[in-house]
Amino acid sequence: MAQRKILITSALPYANGPTHLGHLLEYIQTDIWSRFQKLQGHEAYYVCADDAHGTPIMLNAQKQGITPEEAVEKVSIERQRDFADFNIKFDNYHSTHSQENKELSELIYNRLNDAGHIKRHTISQLFDPEKGIFLPDRFVTGTCPTCKSENQNGDNCDSCGATYSPTDLINPRSVMSGAEPILKDSEHYFFDLPAFEGMLKEWLHSGTIQQEMANKLDEWFTDGLQQWDISRDAPYFGFEIPNAPGKYFYVWLDAPIGYMASFKNLCDKKGIDFDAFWAADSDAELYHFIGKDIIYFHSLFWPAMLEGANFRKPTNVFAHGFVTVNGEKMSKSKGTFIKARTYLDNLNPEYLRYYYAAKLSGGIVDLDLNLEDFAQRVNSDLVGKVVNIASRCAGFITKKFDGKLSATVMQPQLLKEFQAAAPSITAHYENREFSRAIREIMALADKANQFIDAAAPWVLIKDETKQQEAHEVCSLGLNLFRVLITYLKPVLPEMADNVEAFLNDDLAWDGVQNALVSHPINKFKPLMQRVEMDKVNKMVEESKESLESKVTIDPNSPLAKEPICDEIEFDDFAKVDLRVAKIAKAEHVEGADKLLKLTLDLGGETRQVFAGIKSAYAPEDIEGKLTVMVANLKPRKMRFGMSEGMVLAAGPGGKEIYILNPDDGSEPGMRVM
């Protein structure tokens, strides 16, 4: 088989928050494919980087009182540790905020500009007059122009699903300051995407992406492609556009160039020929693994940019679906929005690698992580089937046969059946049909266990006349196990490493065609523990605690101005006796600027209360009304007399004070519960 040159990427994770199990699907999928290609002997490289630019990162850094670079580094350290602990092995992990990315972004931009593919237009944008910044879509909220729902984002409505421009919002507000944005003109730079329409139509239907995605992207051509805004105004964290002071590359322009930059960084360190992989006439293969939500960036904008800048286009763009948990969208309140680190604190990372592989196909379907099925499948397949083969054979080899396998292979036809599965399993991995590969491997594991069950070496070993047969049964069992683990090596690299140490053998893909005979092995050690549901449940509970739902609060709202107090115990709250009271009489208090003297009827007794509501109410406006009072508050002696309770009211003060009024049907003396 000829050696191929292969460059593999996953989408660059945005450096603005922790990794969760939904993110990990893509990196596990890509890592499995990368490991498989390397096992085939190909020159394959898997690169990635932090997506480090944009307004959200800039603002997040400001909140923390650190620089954007420091904010990115903080997230990157945590993320790379998570990736490493999930056995995701990059050949290089870099950052889009790098010298390589700056140089390549400028190179591509200059080539596009020189070729006439960069246009300039003046546009009107919402601008925060208090913060002095143009507002991205998600930094504006207001009332939906379609359904009139309040507190909706600047680009789409969560209530009715409508999409719109931020300028279409009713009563828009800046998320940053609460101020009403103003419209302000600015010159922006645009990439002339329509100039590449013919090329894109042909490229999309040349087998470069899944057919269902190609059909979906055809919708972009129905109304005609639009020029793409590739600039943002200062202040902005990113790279300044050449010869355009105060203008910066939009994050989605330099983010995919980050693939090139990370590989360039690797090339410079390892002496690899960069142009052999990226030149327009390159015969290397380039594969992008991405989520289905960013397909249009990678299959419209990105190939057009590469074409216009005289670089090669991707060989394939592989899109995958989203992760659900227990059949539902990941939920913080239910504890199913699980961070990578929370998982790692409780469970073996290879459990998840296997479960994802067992459900992944080459299509674009969402993957459900059903936690009960997850435990059952790992326990049944890996512990009950695969590891069980070795655990039932290894001990006899060590104790009875000096730790050496037999000199001959009994039932060579059975071993050949396992070896003959290599081309089929190879094809499944190549086509990203991991679930099919797993099904075929597990079917072989069933056959291995059936062989051992029928041969019963634990019975043979007790018969002195059948020692050789017992030796050969256990030796064949371990040879079958060796083939299975080799097939699983891209999925379970840590287990494969441990098996290599146990068998004293390098598990090479073409090595399955040979048998281990008269071969010494080491003492068997447990390779995998069963998944315990109490640990799964503990992980879910910890996710509820560590990822408790946070509500986005309008900075101009009462809740933002006066946050909720610390929690109290229910017993403390139960001590407060709230009662409905009728304001029988209200009077001005001589010498008091803020107080009214209220006589409250509790339906059997009266109380005198001094309330600081004079700025909002005249006495005659509230006499006869029902309100709510704290009836068991210890009387307090004031300069104007004794106050025997407290009336409940809301508001920031001044004219904005609002007495609480119980609903119709309430009577004086009733307890409020």
UniProtKB/Swiss-Prot annotation:
Q: Where does ATP bind?
A: K332
Q: Does the keyword Nucleotide-binding apply?
A: yes
Looking at the record, the residues that make up the tRNA-binding domain are 572-673
- Give residue numbers for sequence motif 'HIGH' region: 13-23
Tell me the residue numbers annotated for binding Zn(2+): C144, C147, C157, C160
Give GO cellular component annotations, separated by semicolons.
Answer: cytosol
Q: What is its EC number?
A: 6.1.1.10
Question: What are the protein's UniProt keywords?
Answer: Aminoacyl-tRNA synthetase, ATP-binding, Cytoplasm, Ligase, Metal-binding, Nucleotide-binding, Protein biosynthesis, RNA-binding, tRNA-binding, Zinc
Indicate which residues form the motif 'KMSKS' region: 329-333
Q: Cofactor note, please?
A: Binds 1 zinc ion per subunit.
* Cofactor names: Zn(2+)
Which reaction does this enzyme catalyse, per its entry? Answer: tRNA(Met) + L-methionine + ATP = L-methionyl-tRNA(Met) + AMP + diphosphate
SUPFAM superfamilies assigned: Anticodon-binding domain of a subclass of class I aminoacyl-tRNA synthetases, Methionyl-tRNA synthetase (MetRS), Zn-domain, Nucleic acid-binding proteins, Nucleotidylyl transferase
Q: Where in the cell is it found?
A: Cytoplasm
Q: Name one GO biological process term.
A: methionyl-tRNA aminoacylation
Matching entries from NCBIfam families are given as: metG (TIGR00398), metG_C_term (TIGR00399), PRK00133.1 (NF001100)
Q: To which protein family does this belong?
A: Belongs to the class-I aminoacyl-tRNA synthetase family. MetG type 1 subfamily.
Q: Tell me, how does this one assemble?
A: Homodimer.
Q: Which HAMAP family match?
A: Met_tRNA_synth_type1
Entry function: Is required not only for elongation of protein synthesis but also for the initiation of all mRNA translation through initiator tRNA(fMet) aminoacylation.
Name it.
Answer: Methionine--tRNA ligase
Protein source organism: Pseudoalteromonas translucida (strain TAC 125)
